[in-house]
């Protein structure tokens, strides 16, 4: 079992994911990891046709676990929360190309018609003022033209509102005031709405501060830690 876990981590590039999270923890004060989730992975496979004797391409698919690194710039927790356990919800921002949005139609529980409608409405991404500096671009105009902004919500939702949005609930859940959901929105369209699949329900993120700030959600990184000492030395 231990060897299988190590192999799965290696195949899913978990080391690179952890490196990115640790880098942001040191630089910005907080690293964020999402998951684990299962994804369909395709592997090349050829099968000999018994009639023709020729090899035919027949890829195999299997479910594999995967974790993701989420940038602090794309992670919006409940503003009243100090830790993830206190958070009522979190929102993650995705910036996808047109083909990436279209690929969502092949993933489970995504609404194909809503995705098509969102694509027909055109790109919705607008760069924030700080992003040109972060990405070292003089202009983001060309980048903005072909990108779609998708907001992924994890948290509680009013039961009646969830049912109006097309979420099917079991009979024993109709009396609940709120339900835990995962909702994806693009161009104002709900492209995915499902119940939180985890038991017990939880927010599928791990937040790792470099140095804990007891009164804020995000931690303190190395540059902020060094700021006072560097100011004194420069003075």
Regions found by a protein language model. Name each.
Residues 1-235:
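Extended alpha-helical, oligomerization-prone segments that build pores/tubes and scaffolds
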């Amino acid at each position: 079992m231990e060897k299988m876990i190590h192999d799965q981590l290696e195949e899913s590039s978990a080391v690179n994911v952890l490196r990115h999270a640790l880098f942001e923890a040191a630089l910005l004060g907080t690293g964020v990891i999402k998951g684990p989730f299962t994804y369909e992975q395709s592997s090349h496979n050829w099968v000999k046709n018994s009639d023709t004797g020729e090899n035919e391409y027949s890829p195999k698919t299997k479910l594999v676990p995967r974790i993701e690194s989420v940038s602090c710039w794309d992670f919006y927790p409940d503003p009243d929360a100090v830790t993830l356990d206190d958070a009522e919800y979190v929102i993650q921002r995705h910036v996808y190309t047109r083909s990436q949005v279209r690929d969502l139609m092949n993933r489970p529980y995504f609404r194909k018609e809503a995705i098509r409608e969102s694509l027909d409405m055109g790109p919705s991404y607008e760069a924030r003022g700080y992003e040109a500096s972060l990405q070292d671009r003089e202009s983001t105009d060309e980048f903005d033209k072909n990108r779609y902004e998708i907001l992924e919500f994890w948290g509680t939702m009013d039961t009646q509102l969830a049912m109006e949005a097309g979420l099917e609930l079991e009979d024993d859940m109709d009396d609940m005031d709120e339900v835990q959901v995962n909702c994806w929105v693009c161009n104002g369209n709900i492209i995915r709405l499902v119940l939180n699949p985890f038991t017990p329900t939880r927010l599928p993120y791990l937040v790792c501060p470099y140095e804990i700030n007891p009164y804020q959600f995000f931690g303190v990184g190395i540059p902020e830690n060094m700021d006072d000492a560097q100011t004194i030395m420069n003075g």
